[in-house]
């Protein structure tokens, strides 16, 4: 993660953010945050308001953020959703409701709130059920002909041109996210995860002290597992795409 970008993004989203809040948001010590603020002042990403003493994001800071601007989002919605049987016999899993709201629509609205409107939904099973979203939210649909036999890597393969050279969210249609976690700017590739106690057949992650994923394996116990949204930076996608082509 680019720490200068995270500092600039924090002031872009909340000009009144405090150093203590920054430390909490970035999971850093106050001392590290203080040093980063000093670096951002030297680079002219921030300036100090002479009247209030507050830090202000500068034009140079906004210019620095542009490299991290999110270009769009891809939502995978092609699968049958066997875990939701019998609900998915007639309704795709992403169109199931939680608290009276369809899961995929909630994510689309959260993306819109973050200023992200270039959204493509990868469809397969009962693909016609998603067509109403085109008019309602101006999304695009892309058909994955291998949805019944292959996994999400095949989905990324069919959508690879949407990721090539772009900063993109990769979401799954059947996630319900309480708080909006999307941003106009993302300062590095990431994959969200949850901790699972006991045995699991999910994709289990190993990471170093800096939170960088070092390995992935199918199945494990008492482990962090791949679960939920991901963000693929253009640099990450440019390395990933040749591996799946």
Segments (PLM) and residue ranges:
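Short amphipathic alpha-helical interface segments
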Residues: 1-25
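Short, cationic-aromatic polyanion-contact patches
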Residues: 1-3, 18, 51-68
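N-terminal glycine-rich phosphate-binding loop and ensuing alpha1 helix
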Residues: 9-12, 60-127
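Key DNA-contact positions within bacterial/archaeal DNA-binding proteins
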Residues: 31
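A short, conserved structural fragment
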Residues: 41-51
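Conserved beta-loop-beta/alpha segment of the NTase-like Rossmann-fold superfamily
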Residues: 128-204
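Conserved core of the sugar-phosphate nucleotidyltransferase
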Residues: 177-245
């Amino acid at each position: 993660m680019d720490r200068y970008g995270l500092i600039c993004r924090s002031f872009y989203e909340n000009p009144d953010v405090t150093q203590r809040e920054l430390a909490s948001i970035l999971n850093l010590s106050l001392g590290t945050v203080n040093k980063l603020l000093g670096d951002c002042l030297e680079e002219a990403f921030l300036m100090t308001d002479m009247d209030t003493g507050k830090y202000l994001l500068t034009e140079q800071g906004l210019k620095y953020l542009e490299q991290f601007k999110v270009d769009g989002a891809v939502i995978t919605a092609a699968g049958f959703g066997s875990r939701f049987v019998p609900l998915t016999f007639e309704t795709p899993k992403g169109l199931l409701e939680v608290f009276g709201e369809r899961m995929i629509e909630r994510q689309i609205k959260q993306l819109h709130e973050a200023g992200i409107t270039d959204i493509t939904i990868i469809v397969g099973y009962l693909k016609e059920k998603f067509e109403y979203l085109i008019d309602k939210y101006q999304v695009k649909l892309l058909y994955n002909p291998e949805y019944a036999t292959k996994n999400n890597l095949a989905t990324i393969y069919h959508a690879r041109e949407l990721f090539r050279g772009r900063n993109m969210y990769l979401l799954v249609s059947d996630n319900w996210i309480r708080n909006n976690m999307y941003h106009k700017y993302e300062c590095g590739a990431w994959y969200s995860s949850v901790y699972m106690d006991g045995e699991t057949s999910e994709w289990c992650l190993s990471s170093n002290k800096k939170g960088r994923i070092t390995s992935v394996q199918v199945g494990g116990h008492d482990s962090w597992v791949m679960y939920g949204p991901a963000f693929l930076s253009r640099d990450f996608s440019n390395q990933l795409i040749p591996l799946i082509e």
